[in-house]
Amino acid sequence: MAQSDITIDALSKVGQQDAEYLVSLVRSVPGFPKEGIIFRDFMPVLADPKGLKILLKALEEALPVSPSEFDSIAGLESRGFLFGPVMAAHLGKGFIAVRKAGKLPPETIGESYDLEYGTASVEIETDAVQAGKRVLIVDDLIATGGTAKAATDLIEKAGGTVVGFSFVMRLDGLDGLDKLDGKPSSSLIAMPA
């Protein structure tokens, strides 16, 4: 699939040349992980020093809310772990790891969500979110929105408030943004599902 199907969204905040450079690094892999799926691989962005610098700059410049409006960044396993802690450190915020079930030591709290063929769960440690903490959720991709919604429910169950979402990529046509309850969100690039 050609890169021409990728729309520069909030990525434009870093300038056209840098935006086009970053998009050129995103690899489309048809048939992975199964037939009918086009996997959008942004690992080449992380391997490229210039691409990584552009990505982190763009994520910070395209925040859906001001840094003064959140206390912590929650990164969703696994690719949200790649840039969430770096963003948190650079912005002077804490980082919350939202993990797949069974990956954290007790005590944890969890939230289940539906998949196409079953269910999955995400967890955080019980002391990761204090009452009233304001959280920005970051991840590489929003598709159906199930994981982002489960992470929101989990953080709110723990007493926190999700104030927004920051995604590298958004797959259009899957209505994932509809599950974010109208909270502010940003995505750097948009692609067809």
Curated annotation (Swiss-Prot):
- Enumerate the InterPro entries for this protein: Ade_phspho_trans, PRibTrfase_dom, PRTase-like, UPRTase/APRTase
Report the EC code(s) recorded for this entry: 2.4.2.7
Pathway note: Purine metabolism; AMP biosynthesis via salvage pathway; AMP from adenine: step 1/1
- GO-annotated biological processes: adenine salvage; AMP salvage; purine ribonucleoside salvage
If you read the UniProt record, what top EC class would you report for this enzyme, in one word?
transferase
**Subcellular location per the Swiss-Prot or TrEMBL entry:** Cytoplasm
Q: Which Gene3D superfamilies match?
A: 3.40.50.2020
> Cross-referenced Pfam families, in alphabetical order?
Pribosyltran
Q: Which terms are listed as keywords in the entry?
A: Cytoplasm, Glycosyltransferase, Purine salvage, Transferase
A GO CC term assigned to this protein in UniProt: cytoplasm
One GO MF term attached to the UniProt entry: adenine binding
Entries under PROSITE patterns matching the protein? PUR_PYR_PR_TRANSFER
Q: Which reaction does it catalyse?
A: AMP + diphosphate = 5-phospho-alpha-D-ribose 1-diphosphate + adenine
> So what family is this one in?
Belongs to the purine/pyrimidine phosphoribosyltransferase family.
The role this protein plays is: Catalyzes a salvage reaction resulting in the formation of AMP, that is energically less costly than de novo synthesis.
What quaternary arrangement does the UniProt entry report?
Homodimer.
Q: HAMAP family, from UniProt?
A: Aden_phosphoribosyltr
| Record-linked PANTHER family | ADENINE PHOSPHORIBOSYLTRANSFERASE
Name of the protein described by the UniProt record: Adenine phosphoribosyltransferase
User: Organism source for this protein?
Assistant: Bifidobacterium longum (strain NCC 2705)
